[in-house]
Swiss-Prot record:
Molecular-function GO terms, alphabetical: UDP-N-acetyl-D-glucosamine:N-acetylmuramoyl-L-alanyl-D-glutamyl-meso-2,6-diaminopimelyl-D-alanyl-D-alanine-diphosphoundecaprenol 4-beta-N-acetylglucosaminlytransferase activity; undecaprenyldiphospho-muramoylpentapeptide beta-N-acetylglucosaminyltransferase activity
Superkingdom to which the source organism belongs: Bacteria
Enzyme Commission designation: 2.4.1.227
One GO cellular component, as annotated: plasma membrane
UniProt gene name: murG
One GO process term, biological-process aspect: carbohydrate metabolic process
Family designation: Belongs to the glycosyltransferase 28 family. MurG subfamily.
Name listed for the protein in its UniProt record: UDP-N-acetylglucosamine--N-acetylmuramyl-(pentapeptide) pyrophosphoryl-undecaprenol N-acetylglucosamine transferase
Length: 385
């Protein structure tokens, strides 16, 4: 059986799309090895049929610390990849792929890179000259060298299996959430301890906002959004609102106090183990604009207000969100220019003009691709034909 190596790490946003690709390749009869770093070790599930290898490559701002570690990891990568005897290596960008990709070049093994963002990252830009193909999630990639344009293949984003399973649900804001979601399923979705949780919740008049900001910028979300909701409810006191929000434990008490006084239902979590459950009942998402988030929302057609993380590498989150906004598939509010008043007005505008949400949902679905399938096809066409 032919062997393929995937290389991804650093964050779950790189790790999970690579896993989804690996699962598709295994279905096609390949043996899949996955090289990742210590940060992603926590995501590895023993039920996965992928063979994992952990390399210790950390990000250092000091080049004199980084180079010795890179050299050691490069030698380990050469030994590992040589022993695996793979046919191709797929890199997903980010610093953890540097040593294995250099090793692949040294061993003359074909490489394909996947760029999840609308802005070609530094690592992928460097390896683009050595890659057979560059698979992309977007049709318009910024920071792309002229020589690399002929290598571009639009495969779309790669989405986790549990999100792909939502494909049978169709977004409809007029029916509260996804049209095939029954009241029983809706009730079972939520923690029974959620404030205000009862059978009335499935009423179509309730508008649900799902808010998640990841570990970076959590403080902003915990302060900005409750203030915006307070303004929103003052402007529209009859609004039946439900909030599902990611928030750190030390922020939850203060936010609960605000929401309780506004008489709205709410649910909090530091981390959502299966985010598909929250997607199911949301009318609108407020989130950062990381590649995985955008890919998942695109796949199920769930509209969002994006607040890009300003410190993201190469400001790629802004470019991701702006591309969707330019295609009327979402809304981009920059953190440096946002205020609670502006956010409240945007939410109210969408609630008052729900056709905007329906249109954005359809525009998202128009961009949807089966990325795990298309990239697998590209690998086979490029390497094995």
């Amino acid at each position: 059986m032919k062997k393929i190596i995937l290389v991804a790490g650093g964050t779950g946003g790189h790790f999970f799309p690579a896993v989804a690709l690996g699962e598709e390749l295994i279905k096609r009869g390949y043996i899949v090895h996955f090289i990742t770093d210590l940060r992603c070790k926590k995501y590895i599930n023993k039920d996965m049929k992928i063979i994992f290898h952990i390399l210790n490559l950390k990000r250092f701002s000091n080049i004199f610390l980084f180079l010795p570690i890179l050299s050691i990891t490069f030698l380990k990568s050469i030994r590992l990849i040589y022993n695996i005897k793979c046919c191709v290596i797929i890199g997903f960008g980010g610093y953890p792929v540097i040593a294995p990709m250099f090793a692949a070049i040294f061993l003359r093994i074909p490489i394909i890179i996947h760029e999840q963002n609308s802005y070609l990252g530094k690592v992928n830009k460097f390896f683009a000259r050595f890659a057979k193909k560059i698979a992309t999630s977007y049709e318009d990639i910024k920071n792309l060298p002229e020589f690399a344009k002929s290598k571009i293949v639009l495969t779309g984003g790669i989405v986790r299996k549990n999100i792909r399973e939502l494909d049978s649900f169709m977004y409809s804001v007029s029916q509260h959430s996804l049209t095939k979601l029954t009241q029983t399923a809706l009730t079972n979705t939520f923690n029974p301890l959620v404030k205000g949780r009862n059978d009335e919740f499935a009423n179509s008049n309730i508008f649900t906002i799902f808010i998640f900001g990841g570990s970076q910028g959590a403080k902003l979300f915990s302060e900005l959004i409750p203030a915006s909701i307070k303004i929103l409810m003052k402007k529209q006191p009859s609004l039946e609102l439900n909030i599902i929000q990611q928030a750190a434990l030390d922020h939850q008490v203060k936010i609960k106090d605000i929401y309780s006084k506004l008489n709205i239902t709410y649910e909090f979590a530091e981390f959502f183990d299966n985010i598909a459950l929250q997607y199911k009942v949301a009318n609108l998402v407020i989130s950062r604009a990381g590649a995985s988030t955008i890919e998942e929302l695109t796949y199920i057609g769930l509209p969002a207000i994006f607040i890009p993380l300003p410190s993201a590498a190469d400001n790629h989150q802004y470019y991701n969100a702006k591309l969707l906004e330019d295609n009327k598939a979402g809304w981009c509010l920059e953190q440096n220019n946002i205020s609670s008043e502006k956010l409240a007005d945007k939410i109210l505008d969408l609630i008052s003009n729900r056709q905007l949400l329906e249109d954005a949902s359809q525009n998202l679905l128009n961009r949807k691709k089966e990325g795990h399938v298309l990239l697998s096809n590209l690998i086979e066409d490029t390497v094995f034909l």
